[in-house]
Amino acid sequence: MASPDRSKRKILKAKKTMPLSCRKQVEMLNKSRNVEALKTAIGSNVPSGNQSFSPSVITRTTEITKCSPSENGASSLDSNKNSISEKSKVFSQNCIKPVEEIVHSETKLEQVVCSYQKPSRTTESPSRVFTEEAKDSLNTSENDSEHQTNVTRSLFEHEGACSLKSSCCPPSVLSGVVQMPESTVTSTVGDKKTDQMVFHLETNSNSESHDKRQSDNILCSEDSGFVPVEKTPNLVNSVTSNNCADDILKTDECSRTSISNCESADSTWQSSLDTNNNSHYQKKRMFSENEENVKRMKTSEQINENICVSLERQTAFLEQVRHLIQQEIYSINYELFDKKLKELNQRIGKTECRNKHEGIADKLLAKIAKLQRRIKTVLLFQRNCLKPNMLSSNGASKVANSEAMILDKNLESVNSPIEKSSVNYEPSNPSEKGSKKINLSSDQNKSVSESNNDDVMLISVESPNLTTPITSNPTDTRKITSGNSSNSPNAEVMAVQKKLDSIIDLTKEGLSNCNTESPVSPLESHSKAASNSKETTPLAQNAVQVPESFEHLPPLPEPPAPLPELVDKTRDTLPPQKPELKVKRVFRPNGIALTWNITKINPKCAPVESYHLFLCHENSNNKLIWKKIGEIKALPLPMACTLSQFLASNRYYFTVQSKDIFGRYGPFCDIKSIPGFSENLT
């Protein structure tokens, strides 16, 4: 039986929808069970050795239902029809002979019985009935062998039972009244279908003896089919004859032998049927197995096709992934190449810039060397020109010596009162360096030379009567003028002997109320110049040497705190040092000169960025307040500046504070004071 699906097997149920093979198997099992039940019943009903037994009723019913070959069973029976028909023919010929013998024996009894009956009633001999029925069964066996074998089996069982009864009965019973059964066989055969065949045999024997004994009633009934046939009473005839007993015994023996032969033939036929059925079932199983194998092959082919399709999909997907990976690798390689190329270009640019910078540095160094050569030539020219005129006048040399002493003492540039010249200088850029060179000619004409260095200024004066004003314009250009005097050539020697080669004035432009001015006033005589120089020296000494107390002054302003971002950078450096301040008053022009310096510079201190100037002045109307009057960018020490604009006050107080490049402020210097002006200086 082929299963529809290997994964899901259906549960077999006895329903109308059951397949034909299953139905046939169920029918065969039911038939085999019925045969076994009949055999057990026969074995239990046979007496074991008792010659006399009580009246008993034995009933055997064999139901055989043979339907005509229907549409559902036709396919299963066609395969075995030929083999079964041949065996049934042979079997039927073997069975007909004992049946005829039994029938002839019974006809003899019938003749004996019928001799005592009335001539009007004629009974049909049972031999003819049985032979006709056997022939009918043989005719129907061609259509269905199983039906014929069951019919003959029922006849054999019936005769066997009768023979057993007759053998067990004593002769006294046989000498009595014997009632022979009338067998009625009903066979219905359709034109094309044989629905049912029923053989009903009934035997009622009642023997009554003249000695008032009860007779044994023996009933043997064979039922074949689903519908039982009603029992019909037969004619009972009383026969008293002793001659018939021997014939009955002989017929019983013959019936026994025929029954045994039939049983042996039946067993052989049953075995042949079993083998045929087994072969049929084996063929069916082989057919179902073949179908299952075909289905399995189909399913395996489908599975293989599905596997091939899935493999193709996987390979296509892997190809796509491989292509994407290659594209990604190419893009990464391109990016790396671009990055390396960019770095290479940057390096090439740096090398080119280095070459450019080296060229620029070479040019700058060449310019510096050129300037140095020019400065040296100017200095040599001045020395060579001024040496012959150094000893021309003693008075001029005295004035020069006095002015040199003042410059050495105060460390600042002071204009000589003899010359009545004032010099004011304002640096705009600490990084720029310049030098002013003055070339003197033999005919005492004015000559001015300028260079790119603005931090160094060289001044030479030809005559004490000359004034050399230096004014600063917004473009930070310095001009040095030298004029000729009309008095005497001795004044030139006196001016050269002073050696005022370098005078620096660092007054910053833009200080609060401080403007640099350079008035020009001619001097008439040497006596006035000498007296003025004598007056300025004690004033400067008094301003420096007089100690004063500044308790009445307000406290100095507190510097702002440094930025927190610069704390880490300033760990290894110290704040700026405390400077030393000096104050001096000048008259022409009227003003105050400030100078400051640091004697011992600590290398651990950070570089100074700028210096801050503070002023406090006494006034009856105003309070004492410290004011920041200016901020000067740091230059190499010592430094100086000149203040020319003041408000009227009794006394002025000055202090200086330095600031480094990190924004830290150093301590204030010692406060210095100087007498004030009665009038406002503008």
Swiss-Prot record:
Keyword Lipoprotein: no
Subcellular location per the Swiss-Prot or TrEMBL entry: Nucleus
Pfam families per the UniProt record, alphabetical: ATF7IP_BD, fn3_4
One MF term in the entry's GO annotations: transcription coregulator activity
Keyword Cytoplasm: no
Region listing for Disordered, in residue ranges: 120-148, 418-491, 513-538
Modified residues (Phosphoserine): 416, 488, 521
Domain Fibronectin type-III: 575-680
Stretches of the chain forming a coiled coil according to its record: 328-378
Residue spans of biased composition, Polar residues class: 137-148, 418-451, 462-490, 528-538
Any one of the GO CC terms: nucleus
GO biological process, one term: regulation of DNA-templated transcription
Lineage top rank: taxon: Eukaryota
Keyword vocabulary terms for this entry: Activator, Coiled coil, Nucleus, Phosphoprotein, Repeat, Repressor, Transcription, Transcription regulation
Broad class of where this protein is predominantly found: nucleus
Family per record: Belongs to the MCAF family.
Chain's role: Recruiter that couples transcriptional factors to general transcription apparatus and thereby modulates transcription regulation and chromatin formation. Can both act as an activator or a repressor depending on the context. Mediates MBD1-dependent transcriptional repression, probably by recruiting complexes containing SETDB1. The complex formed with MBD1 and SETDB1 represses transcription and probably couples DNA methylation and histone H3 'Lys-9' trimethylation (H3K9me3) activity.
Oligomer status and interactors: Interacts with MBD1, SETDB1 and SP1. Probably forms a complex with SETDB1 and MBD1.
Protein name according to UniProt: Activating transcription factor 7-interacting protein 2
Gene source species: Homo sapiens
Source species taxonomy: Eukaryota, Metazoa, Chordata, Craniata, Vertebrata
